[in-house]
């Protein structure tokens, strides 16, 4: 499972979502309009940060 952690604005609490594919996760992270988004792989390493 791929994890997406998003922040709506600088002082908001992070929201965590899980995805089956990196492509779906990347699409939401890149186009979701978030203040910050991190894509975390299965071993807990941040692969992408927007």
Across the structure, where does each feature detected by a protein language model lie?
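Short, mixed-charge low-complexity intrinsically disordered segments
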Residues: 14, 31-50
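A short, exposed loop/beta-hairpin motif centered on an aromatic-Gly-Thr core
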Residues: 11-23, 46
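A short beta-strand micro-motif
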Residues: 2-9
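Short, surface-exposed linear segments at secondary-structure transitions and domain or protein termini
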Residues: 22-33
């Amino acid at each position: 499972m791929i994890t997406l952690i998003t922040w709506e604005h600088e002082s908001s609490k992070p929201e965590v979502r899980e995805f089956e594919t990196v492509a779906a996760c990347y699409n939401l992270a890149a186009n979701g309009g978030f203040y910050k988004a991190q894509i975390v792989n299965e071993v807990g390493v941040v692969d992408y940060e927007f």
